[in-house]
Amino acid sequence: MKIINGEYSGRNFYMPFGIRPTQNLLRKAVFDIIGHDLSGLSFLDLFAGSGAMGLEALSCSAAEVCFVEHDQRNAKVIEDNLVLLEPSKRGLKAKVLHQDSFATIKQFAREGRHFDVVFFDPPFGLKLGKKTLKALLTHDILTPLSHVVAQYGLEERMPDTAGRWTLLKHKQYGASWLTVYQKNEERDPPPILGGVRGG
């Protein structure tokens, strides 16, 4: 697999065995929305898998990227990719947490940690997309005007409205949906989860 955005564009990275890779078109679409220059911003990659999205964020100069991956083998591959790319040489911070994504959301809320971009791509068969979205709404770890980016299976549905989050994009890419929200602190919040997005 190759990185397609930013400083590391064209660089290869390791893929864990059995992981479903995030399509190039989808990765490009995400960064076309959130921007190709993430200087000074923090990025959280939940259910990180190969860590492809977090690596793209580092390539786009995100100041800090946190990868959360429960599977030890996958987490080790992400660590190997960070050794390969050496983001610290560009003054960027990257950390891999080998733990559960839902527990991590609660932990960050207790610690007062906040992120500018949160990406999540849980295993499709478990239908965890909406549960993850609700956890992010309940345990607010997002900065004002932050983005939430969700990739999930076609069998799931996501809300049109989610608290103070505005829907920016909803599109099918192969066997997955991509839904992007932006937080808007000035907007009166509608019901936490309203409407659905899907087929």
Where are these regions (language model features)?
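Class I S-adenosyl-L-methionine-dependent methyltransferase catalytic core
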Residues: 1-199
